[in-house]
Each structure stands twice: as structure tokens, then as C-alpha cells.
Amino acid sequence: MGPQSPASRASEAARELNVNSRFGDVAGTATMTSPNVRAQYVSRRAEWGKLVRVVDVDLGGFQMTDSEHATVIVDFQWTRVDDGTLRNTRVLQEWASTEGPWMLVRERRQSGDIGLFGEVIAPTTAAPRPDVQFPTRVIN
């Protein structure tokens, strides 16, 4: 089998980075990011496994813009450990391979819930609800 195409290598790198970071290997996957964004990449995922639990990650789209640049859409399903609500966030990642291996060079939230990358969100406190049972009657 011959060498992999640029699209195949880019897709494989994106999948590896996102799946491995989902399972907690943020420090290990940081080497797959451009040095210019590495510190931001790690800090944005600092709460993963602590306050944020990533339940699933899917590559929702992939497009090569040229032989050295790719755009990847990643869908994250996640929860906060203090709130059982399942949340969804779509992230747009830009990848480049100008001098060697494919590297993540930029990412931004495209849509969905905020909080995945450590954004401060106000805790939701439910208002007290009245008792929904019928009143008790004692029959003598």
C-alpha cells in the first residue's frame, strides 16, 4: 500500500487529537498543535475531567482547502459534573501541514452551548416547585 494522501493524514490527525483529548490526554495531544496555540489549547481544556466531562466527540465534517490546509468540524457532547444536562458544542478547527506533520493551528466554537472550553457560565438553580401530589385526607 502506498503512502497516505494529505487528506487521509489530516483526517487521521484530527481524529487522534480529538479522541485522545476526550479521554484525558490533553498534555499528550498538545504536541499536535502549533506552538503558537499550544498554551491556549491546554488552558481551554484545563477543566476536562474535573468540572467538564466530555461524553462523546464526532468529526462532523472535513474539507481540504488545499494540499496543506484542512478545516474540520468537531461535535462535542459534554456535561458539567455539577449538572447532569447533556450539552452539545460544534467546534471549527483549522489544520495545517506546511512543515511536517499535521498541526491544529486554530479552533473556535461555531455553535452550541458555551462552557466546554472553560468559559464562565452562571450556575443554573431551579426555582422551588410546588408539591405535585394530591393533598392527603384522613378518613376516620
Segments (PLM) and residue ranges:
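N-terminal Sec signal peptide cleavage junction
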Residues: 1-3
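Short solvent-exposed beta->alpha transition segments
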Residues: 5-13, 19-73
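Hydrophobic/aromatic beta-strand elements that line small-molecule binding cavities or substrate pockets
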Residues: 58-62, 90-95
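Solvent-exposed coil/turn segments that connect beta secondary-structure elements
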Residues: 67, 75-79, 92, 96-100, ...
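Short, cysteine-centered beta-strand-loop-beta hairpins and adjacent loop/turn segments enriched
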Residues: 78-87
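Low-complexity, intrinsically disordered terminal/linker segments enriched in charged
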Residues: 89, 103-140
